[in-house]
């Protein structure tokens, strides 16, 4: 019975297996009724199915790999463009760099108090170029750092040099623009006598003046050889007889007497071209006369006192008037 059942089952399998193989797979050789052919057909069917599944897997992997490669190849130009062109990320980094630079350039300004400024100005007036030790001392006095003191002195020296240059320019330009409105421009017409041609004044002098004979002589250009001050002294130096004349006539005008005496002694000599001075020592003569009067009174008082006692009276000198006493004394 067991053998019959096995044969029946094999026959059923053999009868069914060709149809299944024809339906499922193509290109399989016909199956014989023998058991060996049936087993080989089944084995070939399984192998072909496994191969088909593996081929499908490989194709899917290839398609996946191809799509990934396409994706990578499509994304690679974007990466190149991002490196070459400007993107928002690079703009942000540039803005950050600019902000950092601005923050570095911005420095905190030092606000000095009035006491600190007063101390710094006094130190600058004493020494414009302090050394390190002096700057440290000033920093200790003013409660500042040495760097702040050094920067302050540097700026103060620059300000001082600028002010000096401006003042020098104002002096060169004629007391600056605010003084130019007060000063009138030089006009040759108004000051023709003081023009550069004043050296040729002998050519402008009329002929009668040049024709006169002067005791001190003239050079080729007609200019006196003697200094005007010395010539003035020569004109007004009195001769030896003037002293006796003035003592005899004290009330006579000295200037007129000098001119008259010089004209009498030298009638051929031309008169002095300079005007005769008046009486420049009138105030001194008044002082001398008052002093002489006081001395005279003192002498009279001393003689009166001496005469009241029994002392021998000294020889009385000849009393002179105040005017004669003042004239006799050299001025």
Swiss-Prot record:
The keyword Nucleus applies. Residues 25-44, 53-116 are annotated as: Disordered. GO terms for biological process: anatomical structure morphogenesis. GO terms for molecular function: DNA-binding transcription factor activity, RNA polymerase II-specific; RNA polymerase II cis-regulatory region sequence-specific DNA binding. GO terms for cellular component: nucleus. Disulfide bonds: none annotated. It is found in: Nucleus. A motif (OAR) lies at residues 289-302. Residues 31-44, 53-66, 83-92 have a biased composition (Polar residues). SMART domains: HOX. PROSITE patterns: HOMEOBOX_1, HOMEOBOX_2, OAR. Residues 101-110 have a biased composition (Basic residues). Residues 105-164 bind DNA. Keywords: Developmental protein, DNA-binding, Homeobox, Nucleus. InterPro entries: HD, Homeobox_CS, Homeobox_Pitx/unc30, Homeodomain-like_sf, OAR_dom. It comes from the Eukaryota. SUPFAM superfamilies: Homeodomain-like. A motif (Nuclear localization signal) lies at residues 295-299. Involved in left-right asymmetry in the developing embryo. Belongs to the paired homeobox family. Bicoid subfamily. This is Pituitary homeobox x.
């Amino acid at each position: 019975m067991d053998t019959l059942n096995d044969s029946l089952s094999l026959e059923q399998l053999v009868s069914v297996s060709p149809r299944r193989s024809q339906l499922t797979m193509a290109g399989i050789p016909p199956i014989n009724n023998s058991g060996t052919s049936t087993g080989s057909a089944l084995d070939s069917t399984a192998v072909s199915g496994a191969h088909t599944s593996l081929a499908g897997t490989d194709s899917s992997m290839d398609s996946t790999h191809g799509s990934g490669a396409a994706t990578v190849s499509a994304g690679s130009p974007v990466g190149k463009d991002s490196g070459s062109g400007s993107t928002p990320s690079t703009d942000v980094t540039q803005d950050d760099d600019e902000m950092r630079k601005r923050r570095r350039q911005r420095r905190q300004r030092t606000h000095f108090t009035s006491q600190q400024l007063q101390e710094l100005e006094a130190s600058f007036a004493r020494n414009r170029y302090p050394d390190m030790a002096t700057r440290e001392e000033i920093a200790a006095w003013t409660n500042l750092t040495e760097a702040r003191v050094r920067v302050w002195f540097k700026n103060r020296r620059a300000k001082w040099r600028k002010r000096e240059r401006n003042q020098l320019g104002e002096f060169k330009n004629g007391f600056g623009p605010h003084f130019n409105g007060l000063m009138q421009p030089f006009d040759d017409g108004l000051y023709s006598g003081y023009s550069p041609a004043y050296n040729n004044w002998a050519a402008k002098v009329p002929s009668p003046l040049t024709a006169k004979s002067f005791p001190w002589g003239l050079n080729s250009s007609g200019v006196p050889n003697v200094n005007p001050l010395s010539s003035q002294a020569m004109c007004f130096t009195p001769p030896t007889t003037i002293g006796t004349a003035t003592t005899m006539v004290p009330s006579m005008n000295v200037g007129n007497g000098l001119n008259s005496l010089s004209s009498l002694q030298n009638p051929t000599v031309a008169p002095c071209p300079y005007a005769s001075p008046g009486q420049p020592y009138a105030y001194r003569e008044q002082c001398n006369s008052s002093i002489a009067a006081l001395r005279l009174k003192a002498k009279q008082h001393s003689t009166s006192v001496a005469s009241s006692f029994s002392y021998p009276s000294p020889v009385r000198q000849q009393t002179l008037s105040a005017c004669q006493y003042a004239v006799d004394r050299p001025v």
